[in-house]
Amino acid sequence: VTLPASLDEAVAALAATPAAVPVAGGTDLMASVNAGQLRPTALVGLGRVREIRGWQYLDGHALLGAGLTHARMGRPDFAALIPALAAAARAAGPPQIRNAGTLGGNIATGAPSGDTLPVLAALEATLVVASPGGGRREVSVSHLLAGMDMLRGGELIGWVRVPLLHAPQIFLKATGRTGPGRATASVALVVDPARREVRCAIGAIAPMPLRPLEAERWAASLIDWDGERGLPQESLTAFGTYVATACVPDPEVPADGGEPPKLPPAVLHLRRTVAALARRALGRALS
């Protein structure tokens, strides 16, 4: 186990030992080890890297350290900064998980049920990645999760750059009857008056958060941005249906032109869950 004192030292340690696995809170790593899915031959511990534990303000953005724990992000001072991310952090499992798990770990693991991921997608956050030799580059969170721009050998997530919107933002999730609050579906929604946009990301139902772009544009077109910005209940319901149909689509029509297969009951339930979450999120954001 290597215990570097700075981010650049950690990157150098990873570059020197390509098989090493970085570890901060270790919540996902230990689960993989206990399940027999991972047997790391070397670890690079990030617990002493103080520069990635806090946050700072920079040009209308918050620069969040990758070592921020969910427990820290759930506190009131952080909630005043980025309410949806704080709500997601508070929902991230039992206290022992929130106390250990980190923002950077949530992103790097990329588990579909990661609560912070749809929030970061809806906020259009970017990553500041540390590279060997002291280099830095920026990567869109959505591009990383979609596999369009992956971390390279020896790289580590240093910070997450999040726009400070001062705009309504909501995070909601649905959980199963068992397990430590693991999401079966989640939604993050932002109403951005400055850009006159609605941005929505659905989590936990696919390998990466899904952005229903047409539904976003449709909802934005209905809002009176210069007035009260409210929408009637039927519009909120239609938005939920629009989002759910986009994210949980109908089966394709067979090539022979026959009847498409019906959605299984579990998939229908998931679609109804997504519709309800999206409807509630937009309603709360506009209220």
Regions found by a protein language model. Give the residues of each.
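C-terminal structural segment of proteins
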Residues: 1-287
